[in-house]
Amino acid sequence: MDGDIRHNSYDDGSEDVLTGEQSIRNFNINFGPQHPAAHGVLRMVLELDGEIVERADPHIGLLHRGTEKLMESRTYLQNTPYFDRLDYVAPMNQEHAWCLAIEKLTGTAVPRRASIIRVLFSEIGRILNHLLNVTTQAMDVGALTPPLWGFEEREKLMIFYERACGARLHANYFRPGGVHQDLPPDLIDDIEIWAKAFPQVLDDIEGLLTENRIFKQRNADICIITEAEIEKWGYSGVMVRGSGLAWDLRRAQPYECYDEFDFKVAVGKNGDCYDRYLVRMAEMRESTKIILQACAKLRAPDGQGDILARGKLTPPKRAEMKTSMEALIHHFKLYTEGFKVPAGEVYAAVEAPKGEFGVYLVADGTNKPYRAKIRAPGYAHLQSIDAVAKGHQLADVSAIIGTMDVVFGEIDR
């Protein structure tokens, strides 16, 4: 050190401050992969100018398992469980798209009872998804009670999954040609009892969040999506409906027997995080109505009957296998070799909870798909994070990821 404290022999930058030539460098930080608000294994490199996000660079692929390639070496039936492992928050909705694609190519008509059961469990999946999304988004912005309440309700729905097919999460319940097995009458009764009580739970969650000052401040006017951006980025689902466009595949291109059900399509006005939260809450109420209608239809005389389109795609009844040699051979061939699908290509899409989940299937006439392209909504949503997060504060990034509703099973595949 020099003797005179007033004259530095080293450059401490104080001269630059006087001349105004100090260069301020932007700050790069890693958001994730172990960040609690990253919803899985998202790694994002954020470039910050103070608190403001200048650039958001998502690094995906940490959960990549090569699903689409693996599917090319499995039979059509063996591929169904892969779909449970994509969006593992609401598994049955993904299986639905795969089964619809196979049924389109083979021209299989699904029995009415199976169709109603599919609708019932698709809507249960929608509630499973939205409950998790709404409550974890509340947790991301600082509320701790909603996730506890939300998980309590999800647990009840998981038990319905388990009672229908034996598995809580990876169900493998939807099959090409119908569903794996029929629902017992007391399960239908219990689902109906639950659906009648559920709106009260939604009221409780809304009481905590909807008019909560902090929740509003953290979500209102954050990540506003315009109509032009929707077309540019390929948004679907709540990301579209939150901006005031009533686009819902259950209405626009009805599949299964959705055209028989009475429900409204919830839309927002402002296209921000808060509106998307409100849309998800409204959708859960509409799904509850659909569940109650489905329970009534399953009890009606025209809702009775078989739950599988008996033929080459589906196994024979257990009783037939005990008496008929042909049935036993058919069962053995189906589960070893699998069924063949006529050559062709088809795109089947369903309104999954996160958006339009589609399967583009190319068949070559064998028992395995030639190529299956999975169109996951979360992938299309996450690609736009740089565009929508730019200019927001660092604290808003977790709200934006929460409102996009990303799950890495389906993004990385």
Swiss-Prot record:
Q: Which Pfam families match?
A: Complex1_49kDa
Q: What is its EC number?
A: 7.1.1.-
Alphabetical GO CC annotations of the entry are:
plasma membrane
The terms under GO molecular function for this entry are: NAD binding; NADH:ubiquinone reductase (non-electrogenic) activity; quinone binding
Q: How does it sit in the membrane?
A: Peripheral membrane protein
| The keyword Signal belongs to this UniProt entry's keyword annotation | no
Broadest EC class assigned to this enzyme: translocase
Which keywords label this protein?
A: Cell inner membrane, Cell membrane, Membrane, NAD, Quinone, Translocase, Transport, Ubiquinone
What this chain does, per the entry, is described as: NDH-1 shuttles electrons from NADH, via FMN and iron-sulfur (Fe-S) centers, to quinones in the respiratory chain. The immediate electron acceptor for the enzyme in this species is believed to be ubiquinone. Couples the redox reaction to proton translocation (for every two electrons transferred, four hydrogen ions are translocated across the cytoplasmic membrane), and thus conserves the redox energy in a proton gradient.
Q: What is this protein called?
A: NADH-quinone oxidoreductase subunit D
